[in-house]
Amino acid sequence: MELKVTTLEGKEAGSVQLSDAIFGLEPRQDIVQRCVIWQLAKRQAGTHKAKGRAEIWRTGKKMYKQKGTGGARHGSQRVPQFRGGGRAFGPVVRSHAIDLPKKVRALALRHALSAKAKGGGLIVIDKAELEAAKTKALVGAFSGLGLTNALIIDGAEVNNGFATAARNIPNIDVLPVQGINVYDIVRRRKLVLTKAALDALEARFK
């Protein structure tokens, strides 16, 4: 698959040949979905907690005698039916992470990249660099490229000026190539790769 390369100013800068093994797969939503669920489950903090009846600080003495009061038969005051009692089957601190094999994760990334390429949501630029970290200038460049909701992937290191200018623009994410992931690709309308990022991805999946 051949794709045009443009500059940030919207000028043509040649073309690039995309690998069919990375960008030419028939997208499978089930594999992509598995990876997204894995990512979102892994990022959950799992710090929610409610005290059970064994953790409530309250006397364990029987409330009143068993018979003769006309009231129901109660023992401990820590039980869930009383105000201030322990929660029955409440949430506990735990990890929400699930297992997903590395090969499936790598396959999901290739399917997400292929889906963007097939749907016309992939743009290749020569480099993502700015001389001055000015958000206004970058907004103008993005407007010329038609980018309002995009994930931009640079090489191993992101240009400081570019990252600083982009961080205040809504719906624009900038990541180094080692940070590329399925969830961020799926949640943004456009995927923008620099030539350095493209070379790194092809070396990674070689």
Swiss-Prot record:
GO terms for cellular component: ribonucleoprotein complex; ribosome. Pfam families: Ribosomal_L4 (PF00573). GO terms for molecular function: rRNA binding; structural constituent of ribosome. The keyword tRNA processing does not apply. GO terms for biological process: translation. Keywords: Ribonucleoprotein, Ribosomal protein, RNA-binding, rRNA-binding. The keyword rRNA-binding applies. It comes from the Bacteria. Belongs to the universal ribosomal protein uL4 family. Part of the 50S ribosomal subunit. One of the primary rRNA binding proteins, this protein initially binds near the 5'-end of the 23S rRNA. It is important during the early stages of 50S assembly. It makes multiple contacts with different domains of the 23S rRNA in the assembled 50S subunit and ribosome. Forms part of the polypeptide exit tunnel. This is Large ribosomal subunit protein uL4.
